[in-house]
Amino acid sequence: MQKNKIYIFILLVAFGFSSCGEYQKVLNKGTSEEQYLLAVKMYDEQKYTKAIQLFEKITPSYKGKPQMERIQYMVSQAHYNTKQYSLAAYYFDKFVKSYPKSSKVEEAAYLSAYSYYLASPVYSLDQKDTKEAITALQTFIYKFPDSDKVPDANKNIKELTLKLEKKSFEIAKQYYHTQDYTAAMVAFDNLLADYLGTSYKEEAMYLKFKSAYYLGTNSIIVKKEERINEAIKVHQRFERNFPNSKYLEETKKLISELSNELNAITVIKTQN
């Protein structure tokens, strides 16, 4: 029994080496047709990395031929199935542009956009892929409004937009926590302008006021009055938008301090 198992194992290893040898032989010395047939075989067997190598090898030979449409689609899918999402997005997009009348164009357009979505990193990293994903998904919805993938595309856009909102909010908070209050106020304004319905609105307006407060109280005398008045205006807008905010008890105390500083400035100006 044990001998039989060893024999079977040896056969499997030998077969593996034989298959590997056949692949390398066709890859390096096979005709374009042999490479194409083996690439399709590797693709069907879900050996996508080997399939990609062969497809890349034969692409120049098949450019302009009927098989090229199938090759480009399989290359796109192979990258997608190996989780190389940035490359998959690129190749699916290339397929859509090269074969706009293909029966697979809608599927390819969605998978291009969805690949960008899958390539989108966590909010703390660069969001280039996130922005490209939103644009691609919006383009897909515009071109294929009746597609059954539209609800998924809208859901993906919402998720990606929330990620960009969080990125914008965290950047503004970072300026605030590093005491760069001028930059913080600009960043909070950008967040509120770019994402009108943002769930961060209350906290953003609160932190913008505190940035204005610290900017005013820490200013040199010639800028203090102007900046304190600006902080008071920022607070008025905050209170108008959130009359029941949990932050109001704190901010009203700060407003009282600012009013006292303004009174002191008025006294100094009167004495001069």
Task: Show which residues each predicted segment covers.
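Acidic, polar-rich low-complexity tracts and alpha-helical solenoid repeat scaffolds
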Residues: 2-8, 16-272
